[in-house]
């Protein structure tokens, strides 16, 4: 089987360029179904999840052309298939984001329930609540969902019980061609929401308030083409910032927007890192010397501490001096990495959605399993400071969210390889 093998690599040093954000690219690619003219997207990350959603679009009738490694042209002018492919939908959760665009453009869609990271229930009921509020009729079974709006969608008011990113995005896209005004209350505020709104407006949509808890969309008759650059991936940036901290390194993260990751910057300073922001160059330098001290984090919807960096920060906490704690409030069942870190000698106790960590002097290399995307990243970070050799298995999870993570770490001086080992 293929593993990522990591050997102790202290004092990482150098620069790393961050790719476009996966969590922005996926909804924007889905939204490309709305345009009746070609769309060009730049800084599209080369990831497994991205290739899956592009295949979904091709199955629906879009023409997808790579102009270079990170530039894609999507022509959805001839899309007329409203049924999503079952085998592709089953591979990735974000594939559900095509439902809103198909519903508003074609008046109907049949889709299969999605797969992806097994983090808690992550239900799609908020998406469906939004579609119903816009006048769609929904029929669902355990496997598939059908939505129909015979006479088109009609603007409405939607209150989200939780500021779900996916639901906010799906409802925004569905509302772009609904008759009248749609108001989403308690909307997600993530930078990826703002990026999607920016893209939709380039297509000719009328979206206001993205980045606040109230988003207003006035429906238009049709949307056209556009050129758009995906924002940098704040989670990838945070991962390499934590890598600098855990290895007592000096790493400059390029192509990142510091205002998108303020909680990470604040917490790294709290544990004892020097963090230098250079907004003119969109870069952040993280310098760590000596042993860092423990801290507390509580995951929250944006602009709070991101749940997608919880596992990586916990890896850092395992070797900080003193006690640390984590409270996970966004997703249930998001401590699957704890057992793997414990195999490496981490002193972690969990109760419900809380974890307490007693910092240890050193971790030990082990064979550990990447249980989800961010857990995989956390185990690589732990391997960088563990004595001996760490083999991270199930690395397909890591490939879903990081493009060429091994070569990026190598450039910083890490002893890391993708290799085949016997099962």
From Swiss-Prot:
The keyword Metal-binding does not apply. Belongs to the EPSP synthase family. MurA subfamily. This is UDP-N-acetylglucosamine 1-carboxyvinyltransferase. It comes from the Bacteria. It is found in: Cytoplasm. Gene3D superfamilies: Enolpyruvate transferase domain. It is an enzyme of class 2 (transferase). Its EC number is 2.5.1.7. Pfam families: EPSP_synthase (PF00275). Pathway: Cell wall biogenesis; peptidoglycan biosynthesis. One of its GO terms (molecular function) is UDP-N-acetylglucosamine 1-carboxyvinyltransferase activity. It catalyses: phosphoenolpyruvate + UDP-N-acetyl-alpha-D-glucosamine = UDP-N-acetyl-3-O-(1-carboxyvinyl)-alpha-D-glucosamine + phosphate. Cell wall formation. Adds enolpyruvyl to UDP-N-acetylglucosamine. GO terms for biological process: cell division; cell wall organization; peptidoglycan biosynthetic process; regulation of cell shape; UDP-N-acetylgalactosamine biosynthetic process. InterPro entries: Enolpyruvate_Tfrase_dom, Enolpyruvate_Tfrase_sf, MurA_subfamily, RNA3'P_cycl/enolpyr_Trfase_a/b, UDP_GlcNAc_COvinyl_MurA. Phosphoenolpyruvate binds at residues 22-23. One of its GO terms (cellular component) is cytoplasm. The active site is at residue 117. The gene is murA. SUPFAM superfamilies: EPT/RTPC-like.
